[in-house]
Amino acid sequence: MGTFFAEVQLASSARPDRRETVKLLVDSGSMYTWVSATVLRDLGVRPTERRRIVTIEGRTTERAAAEILITLEGRALHTLCLFGEPGDLEVLGAYTLEGFGLAIDP
């Protein structure tokens, strides 16, 4: 299976009129959607919690998280998003894919 990207629109749940279009790597191996903290903060998204995660390298770490509004192919939903740090990939994760009723077809 190859890698592919999805173009999505992101917005703060509090400011849905202010949107940013980004391309995210579709990664069903990642539980959560990850987006650059800079992009999220520019949209007015503020962290509401911290999530403990295990990286692909097997390290346990924490990232800030918040609910965002995400639009994919004309459909919108609220989903949990992690604040990516420098070096983190921006990905569309399994939790969000399942929210849209989507899965990767190998």
Positions of predicted regions on the chain:
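Pepsin/retropepsin-fold aspartyl endopeptidases
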Residues: 1-106
